[in-house]
Design a protein with these regions (language model features):
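A compositional/biophysical signature of low hydrophobicity enriched in polar/charged and small residues
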Residues: 1-169
Length: 169
């Protein structure tokens, strides 16, 4: 999910949507297998297929479900290097980077943060040459004053979906 930060001086509306037990169970099942058919979900939960369809439609229209996407194994595509990149930014935000051609293909996550850095990027690369080129291009950005890069030695856990969130509150 990308938050529009065109005017970062305006506080975004903080809306918490409510879900009942059935909605939560549907989300749990879809978090494990996003391709699971409505028919199988309806059997698992003991409700009609129409009910599942209507609930998923409601969850999608309300923005709780943003999209259905595959979970990609980047290693199998040749992206063996994961980098965590801290950015010092001179005014503004890191949000503009996600649309720029040299950056958008490698970025998995972009965060505005507090602390030592103004932004954190998580990116994947095929090799150190690609990472080096990426960093050099970042430093050519007018508002990027410094980068601090850490390469990941071992991925212990990497799930960029919400399957581990406790829906049972």
């Amino acid at each position: 999910m990308v938050q529009d930060m065109k005017d970062y001086n305006v506080e975004p509306e903080n809306i918490t949507l409510s879900m009942d037990t059935l909605d939560k169970k549907i989300l749990e099942l879809l978090s494990v297998d996003g391709r699971k058919s409505y028919r199988k979900i309806s059997r698992d939960l003991g409700v009609s297929v129409g009910t599942i369809h209507n609930r998923v439609d409601k969850l999608t229209k309300s923005g709780i479900i943003n999209k259905f996407v595959p979970v990609i194994d980047h290693e199998k595509l040749g992206y063996h290097l994961t980098a965590i990149i801290g950015l010092e930014i001179k005014g503004g935000t890191v949000a503009h980077l996600i649309e720029k051609e040299p950056f958008k293909n490698n970025l998995l996550a972009v965060y505005d943060v507090t602390g030592q850095f103004d932004g954190i990027l998580i990116a994947k690369f095929k090799n150190t040459f690609e990472l080096n080129k990426f960093i050099k291009q970042l430093l050519q950005e007018d508002n990027v004053t410094r980068t601090y890069t850490q390469t990941v030695l071992n991925i212990v856990k990497e799930e960029l979906n919400s399957s581990m969130i406790d829906f049972e509150e």
